[in-house]
Amino acid sequence: MDVTGMLPVERPYRGKISISREHIRRKHLVKKRVVFTLKGICLIVLLFAALFPVYWLVLMAIRPTAETSMGAGLIPHQITGEHFTELFVGKGFGTALKNSLINAVSALVMSLVLGLATAYIISRKRFRFGMKKPLTYWVLLVRVLPPVAFVIPLYTLFTKWNLMGTRLPIILSCMLVNIPLVIWFMVSFFEELPEEVEESGKVDGATEWQLFTRLVLPLVLPGVAAISMLSFMYAWNEYTYSVILTRSPANYTIPLALAVLNTEDNVTNFGLVAAGGVSSFLPVALFVVFAQNYLISGLSSGAVKE
C-alpha cells in the first residue's frame, strides 16, 4: 500500500490579500492633513517674518520716548501720539510728504504719457531685421543701470538749464528711469491685442488718437494700473537723485527728511524716526491694498511670452 497516497497534499494559496478601502482612505486623509499643517506653519512663519518689522515700526512710533529707551516688550504699556505731533508740527514733515506726492504723481503722469505712446508704436510698427525685441531690451537698459551712472550728466545738464533748486530735477530724473520700464512692460500688452480691434475702429472712421484712447487703452487698463503702481512707488522712495539734486530743505522728499531725522543733533530719536517711517509707507500701503487686484491681474496677464 502506497503510504504517500494517504497523506494530505499542501496546495499553494491562490487567493488575493485584500486591503480595506477605508484604511487607505484614512491613510490618505492623514497624509493630506499633515501636508496642510506643514503648509500652514510655513505660511505663518513667512507672514511673521514679513510683518514683524512693520509691527515693530508701528510699536516704536506709538510708544512714549521713555518706554522706547527702556527696551520694552512686544505689547506697549502706553500709547501716545507725541512722536507724530513733533514730526509734523516741530519738524515740518508734512512738507516732505507734499513734495514726494507732487514729484511722484508728476513723474508718473509724464512717464505714462510718453511711455504708453512709445510702447504702442513699437508694438504696431514692423521693424526690419527683427529689431523689435533688441530695441525693447536696449530701452530697458536705462532702467537696469544704477542711478549713480546718470547723476553727473544730469547734474551738469540741470545746472546748465538753471533748474537746480526746483522740483524739476527730481521729477525729470524719475521720469527718465520710469519711461523704459513703462515701455518694456506695456509692449507685451499691446502685442496681445488683435489688430482687428483697431481695424474695426478704422472702418467706423476713428482717427489714430481715437483708436488709441477709446479702443486700445481701455483693454489694457490692468497693465496700466500695475505699471502705474510700480512707477509711483519708485518715485516715492527715490533717494539717490534726491540727495544730489536737491539743494533747498523746502524741496526735501520723504527719504531725505528721514535721513535728516536720523542724523539731526547727533542723537537718533528712534520713536520720531519710526513715526516718519509709518507716515511714509502708509499712503503707499493703502494705495496698493485698494488696487492689488489690478496689480495681480496686470502682472499675470502681461507676462512676456517667448
Show the residue positions of the predicted features.
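Membrane-topology segments of multi-pass transport proteins
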Residues: 1-35, 68-90
